Every structure is written in structure tokens, then in C-alpha cells.
């Protein structure tokens, strides 16, 4: 019996990941490269069978002169296939790491464009899994970093930055349906090609006489992934190929799931959200004695998840500084990491937002306006939502009993009318429900 072809494998993958009741509309992120163009053709054939409407999006990062023409190539292919297509343009502001900024910008743009669509297909392949495994192995990653990328992953991009695209930049026919009133924020990345090899997808495209673009940066040894790709080719000659590495990463994913289950159990017993004056502070309190009694791996997982939860960061902190912070915490000290601060206070460890990371951030309050990735004041239009800071702290003459100490209170969310403090519910200023906490998804499945 012959092996199933790419279309049959894609249908099986989609059935496993999203079936049997498929959504009526699904988005595809298509760059124009071989992997994503193969996914477009595979999804086209699959969608015609299952009656699913596809919405295709390309993010033009503007980093190469050819990028606009490549996006137009994708748009032309979509027109020929009969699917709506939108090009979203991202421009780097020069701040931070370029690749990280491009990734975050891409997700934020897609999130604003997707409307009510809940699923976006991405074209990561088995080669991507193997290359990522080798890259992280070279950095000394543990189970967390070496585990295979998830076939489904919930994403909730930061929404406190100014909108990077205007509605009129997207043609009406390329705008997906609007979200419903009960739709939760964020979307799911779905990766149906993790079992496919890059070379097989290009063979599929050649058979179809399909078009794709080879990004010249894929041959630039200045990029770590390009060097890793060449290393993988040499390893395959010695019998250590992408299939073996991807299978190892998948086994480590199962080990990670077991470790996460243990961390969830411990966190439920020893970690609690902090409140003051009947309002959430956005901080976490960890029982010192209970936390100290569990195994190191569980401690690290809980601490990493706590830092992610408090900072709304999409990724956990790096292993080495995380381990150093844990040692200081267990010895009664503390420190800063991942935009957070940790301090030992009596019988608890307090994990709170680092004021220095928030000092220069603010947003105009109002419905749908999120500050620091998790705070909203829908009924306070016209006011500014920002950190309390030393200036706001000084305006509160009587500090309530049991309130967070000054070093933590400076990072509390507050509403201002220019320089005048209007509300800081966690310190008894204004109504307790003046601000609402919309925490991100549970990091590593550990809910607080």
C-alpha cells in the first residue's frame, strides 16, 4: 500500500488538530516562502472538501526591497484560488531586538486584523522543530526549551501599543467577520505541517507548478538558524536527522506536560493572587515554607510562570538568571527579572511588577484600551491609565492598612487626570471596580 500524499496527510493533521466540527472560517499566515505557499495550496484543497472559508494574511516587515512584491505574489495567488487576502505592513521603530520585535509585531497585527477568527494556521515544519532543538541545545536549555513547539498554542498579544494599522488600509472584502460580544481576547496558532519535511513541501509545489519565494536571508550564515540548518544537513549524513531530533523533542514535550501537572498542583496550594482594599493588585504571593519544601524543578516552573503572569510576557525568562533569582529568594533575598521584582516579606515571597519597566508607559482609558497587557478601565474615558509612581503615592495622605509596601505600590495601576491622581483601587482611592484585571492565559498551564 502506498503512503498517503501531502493532501491526505494535511487532512489527517487538520482532523486531529481541529476536527471533527471545523470552524466555518480559518485564517492562514502566508509569507510567500515555500512552506507557507505549500500550506496555502493544501488548505485550499482541504477547505473545498470541508466547506471552510479561508482568510489569508501576509505581514510585510519592510526589511527587504522585495518584500512588497512578495506580498503581492501571495495576493495574486489568493485571487486565482478565490480567497480574500490582506497585506499588513509592519515597520521597526529601532527599539530592542529586531527578530523579537518583528515576531511580536507580526502577532499584534494579525490579532487586530483577524476580527472574530479564532484560529490562524502557521507553516512550521519538522525541519523548524529540529533546528529549534539544536539551537536551544547549544544554549544549554532543559526540558522546557528542548520540547517540541506545540501544534496548537493560544496567543494573546499585548494590546497597549497604538494600533499599527488603520482600518482603511485593508480592503473591505479582506476583512474577516467582526468578533462577537462574548469573544475572548487572543487567538490560537495552529501548526498542521509539523510532520512535514521542507523538501517534500517544495516537491509538492513543483508538481503543482506553484510559485514561492526563496528569501535570500535563508542563505546568510550571519543568521543562527541558517548555520543550524547547515549543521543539520551534516548531522543527517551521520544518521542524526530531523526525524530523530523532532521525535526526541516530542518525547520531551510529554515529559514537560507531566512536570507542568506537578507544578499546577503545587501552585494551587502555595500561590495566591494579592488583593488590597477589595481590589486586585496584579501581584502574586508565594508561601515561603511550602515553596521551599518542593523539588527544584517545580520551584523554577512556578517562579517562571509567576514572572510571566505578573509581566504578561509571552515567554518565560532564561534559565540561568531564573535559577539565580530562585537561590536568592530561598535565602530570604530577592531581585528583579523579566520586568518584575521579587522580595521576601515575612512568610511570603511577593512577586510584583517592576516600576522601572512601567515608568514611561501609559494609555488613554476606555473600553478595549489595555495597559501593561492586562489592566482596563472601560468606564474612565478621558483619563490616563498608568503606574501609580512616586508622584501618585505622595498624593495619598492615608495609606490603608494591609496595602502593598511603597516599593511594590509604585507599580500599581492608577487613573490620572493629567498629574492629579483620580483612582487607585488597591490603595482605597476610587471604587474597587474602577479597574479590571484581565490577566494573560495561564503560563505553562499554571493558573493563578
Language model features: what each stretch is:
Residues 48-51, 240, 333, 420:
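Residue-level recognition of short, well-ordered coil/turn positions
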Residues 68, 198-199, 242, 288, ...:
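Alpha-helix N-capping/helix-start residues
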Amino acid at each position: 500500500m502506498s503512503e498517503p500524499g501531502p493532501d491526505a496527510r494535511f487532512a489527517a493533521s487538520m482532523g486531529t488538530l481541529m476536527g471533527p466540527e471545523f470552524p466555518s472560517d480559518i485564517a492562514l499566515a502566508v509569507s510567500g516562502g515555500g512552506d507557507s505557499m505549500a500550506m496555502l495550496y493544501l488548505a485550499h484543497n482541504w477547505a473545498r472538501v470541508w466547506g471552510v472559508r479561508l482568510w489569508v494574511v501576509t505581514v510585510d516587515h519592510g526589511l527587504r526591497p522585495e518584500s512588497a512584491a512578495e506580498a503581492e505574489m501571495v495576493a495574486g495567488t489568493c485571487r486565482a484560488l478565490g480567497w480574500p487576502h490582506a497585506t499588513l505592513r509592519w515597520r521597526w521603530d529601532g527599539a530592542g531586538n529586531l527578530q523579537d520585535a518583528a515576531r511580536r509585531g507580526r502577532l499584534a497585527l494579525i490579532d487586530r486584523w483577524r476580527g472574530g477568527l479564532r484560529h490562524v494556521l502557521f507553516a512550521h515544519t519538522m525541519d523548524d522543530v529540529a533546528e529549534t532543538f539544536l539551537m536551544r541545545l547549544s544554549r544549554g536549555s532543559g526540558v522546557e526549551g528542548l520540547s517540541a513547539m506545540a501544534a496548537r498554542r493560544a496567543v494573546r498579544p499585548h494590546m497597549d501599543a497604538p494600533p499599527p494599522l488603520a482600518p482603511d488600509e485593508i480592503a473591505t472584502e479582506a476583512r474577516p467577520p467582526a468578533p462577537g460580544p462574548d469573544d475572548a481576547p487572543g487567538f490560537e496558532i495552529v501548526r498542521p505541517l509539523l510532520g512535514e519535511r521542507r523538501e517534500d513541501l517544495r516537491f509538492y509545489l513543483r508538481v503543482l507548478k506553484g510559485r514561492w519565494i526563496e528569501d535570500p536571508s535563508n542563505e546568510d550564515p550571519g543568521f543562527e538558524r541558517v548555520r543550524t540548518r547547515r549543521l543539520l544537513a551534516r548531522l543527517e549524513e551521520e544518521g542524526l536527522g530531523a526525524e530523530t531530533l523532532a521525535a526526541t523533542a516530542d518525547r520531551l514535550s510529554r515529559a514537560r506536560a507531566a512536570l507542568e501537572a506537578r507544578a499546577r498542583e503545587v501552585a494551587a496550594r502555595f500561590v495566591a493572587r494579592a488583593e488590597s482594599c477589595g481590589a486586585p493588585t496584579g501581584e502574586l504571593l508565594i508561601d515561603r515554607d511550602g515553596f521551599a519544601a518542593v523539588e527544584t524543578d517545580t520551584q523554577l516552573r512556578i517562579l517562571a510562570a509567576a514572572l510571566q503572569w505578573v509581566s504578561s510576557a509571552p515567554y518565560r525568562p532564561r534559565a540561568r538568571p531564573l535559577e539565580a533569582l530562585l537561590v536568592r529568594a530561598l535565602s530570604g533575598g530577592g531581585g528583579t527579572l523579566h520586568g518584575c521584582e521579587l522580595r521576601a516579606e515575612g512568610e511570603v515571597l511577593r512577586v510584583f511588577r517592576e516600576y522601572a519597566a512601567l515608568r514611561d508607559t501609559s494609555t488613554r482609558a476606555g473600553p478595549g484600551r489595555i495597559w501593561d497587557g492586562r489592566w482596563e478601565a472601560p468606564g474612565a474615558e478621558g483619563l490616563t491609565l498608568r503606574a501609580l509612581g512616586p508622584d501618585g503615592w505622595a498624593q495619598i495622605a492615608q495609606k490603608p492598612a494591609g496595602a502593598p509596601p511603597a516599593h511594590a505600590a509604585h507599580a500599581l495601576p492608577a487613573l490620572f487626570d493629567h498629574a492629579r491622581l483620580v483612582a487607585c483601587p488597591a490603595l482605597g482611592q476610587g471604587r474597587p471596580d474602577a479597574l479590571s484585571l484581565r490577566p494573560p492565559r495561564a503560563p505553562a498551564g499554571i493558573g493563578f
